[in-house]
Amino acid sequence: MKTCIRCTPLLLLLLLLSACAAAPKFDLSAGEIAAGEGLTTLHMPASDLPAPWTAEEEPGKWEAALAYAGIAFDASARADEEGTLKQVTLSADDDGSWAQADVDALVQALNADYGIELVPVVANGTVSLYAFQRNCNEITVTWTAGVSVSLTFQATTPLLPLLQEAQAAMAGEEVQP
């Protein structure tokens, strides 16, 4: 195969760029959670949560102290009635030392770890909300200046079956469970 002399630098540049692009560390489609010891995933049996998670008195709730992106968080996990993990929230108090740049750094860490692009829903300097959803699993980052910052991993309801069910009901068709 012949390569023109003009194309060679471009090919080398493309190879370098593709080699430098880091693969995502975590898979949101699989519900993987980027925090804590061991790999924790949404949809897993909550009884299998690894240390440092501890069960609380309230059924279906666990707590832990975790770190992510160099930030210390208090974390809580919630399970549904069947004991399946559905939500993990990491939160930290904001003593006034957080700024939009800190929130942006947290969002960038999540984007890099998951290979996603969290979308700003609200970002006005005192309240920021970013979100991303993939295959019924979502990540949200919420910051309220002077109050708290939180990071939530959550299993959500698939919308397509709900839309199909609503369309069938509107058409007067029998809805299949």
Where in this protein do the model-derived segments appear?
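Bacterial N-terminal signal peptides that target proteins for export
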Residues: 1-10
